[in-house]
Amino acid sequence: MDSIISAASVIAAGLAVGLAAIGPGIGQGSAAANAVEGIARQPEVEGKIRGTLLLSLAFMESLTIYGLVVALSLLFANPYTG
């Protein structure tokens, strides 16, 4: 039974990292594209746009880090194994 739980944990860890990276990856690409477009339209507010972009990218990246934490806990601190 432990081998089934271990195999399921590895699969779940891979899915956790993969799925946790899809959403923020799409969001970061969209945010960067819109920031570049905004800077091209109004170059005088580049500093404000860049600061807001970096802050929002950090928040989006935290979602991926949460997925990594879940994956690492499934691999190394799995509560379901005996």
Curated annotation (Swiss-Prot):
InterPro entries: ATP_synth_csu_bac/chlpt (IPR005953), ATP_synth_F0_csu (IPR000454), ATP_synth_F0_csu_DDCD_BS (IPR020537), ATP_synth_F0_csu_sf (IPR038662), ATPase_proteolipid_c-like_dom (IPR002379), F/V-ATP_Csub_sf (IPR035921). It is found in: Plastid, Chloroplast thylakoid membrane. The chain crosses the membrane at residues 4-24, 57-77. It is a multi-pass membrane protein. Keywords: ATP synthesis, CF(0), Chloroplast, Hydrogen ion transport, Ion transport, Lipid-binding, Membrane, Plastid, Thylakoid, Transmembrane, Transmembrane helix, Transport. The keyword Ion transport applies. Its main location: plastid. One of its GO terms (molecular function) is proton-transporting ATP synthase activity, rotational mechanism. The record marks 61 as: Reversibly protonated during proton transport. GO terms for cellular component: chloroplast thylakoid membrane; proton-transporting ATP synthase complex; proton-transporting two-sector ATPase complex, proton-transporting domain. F-type ATPases have 2 components, F(1) - the catalytic core - and F(0) - the membrane proton channel. F(1) has five subunits: alpha(3), beta(3), gamma(1), delta(1), epsilon(1). F(0) has four main subunits: a(1), b(1), b'(1) and c(10-14). The alpha and beta chains form an alternating ring which encloses part of the gamma chain. F(1) is attached to F(0) by a central stalk formed by the gamma and epsilon chains, while a peripheral stalk is formed by the delta, b and b' chains. NCBIfam families: ATP_synt_c, PRK07354.1. In plastids the F-type ATPase is also known as CF(1)CF(0). PANTHER family: ATP SYNTHASE LIPID-BINDING PROTEIN, MITOCHONDRIAL, ATPASE PROTEIN 9. Belongs to the ATPase C chain family. F(1)F(0) ATP synthase produces ATP from ADP in the presence of a proton or sodium gradient. F-type ATPases consist of two structural domains, F(1) containing the extramembraneous catalytic core and F(0) containing the membrane proton channel, linked together by a central stalk and a peripheral stalk. During catalysis, ATP synthesis in the catalytic domain of F(1) is coupled via a rotary mechanism of the central stalk subunits to proton translocation. Key component of the F(0) channel; it plays a direct role in translocation across the membrane. A homomeric c-ring of between 10-14 subunits forms the central stalk rotor element with the F(1) delta and epsilon subunits. This is ATP synthase subunit c, chloroplastic.
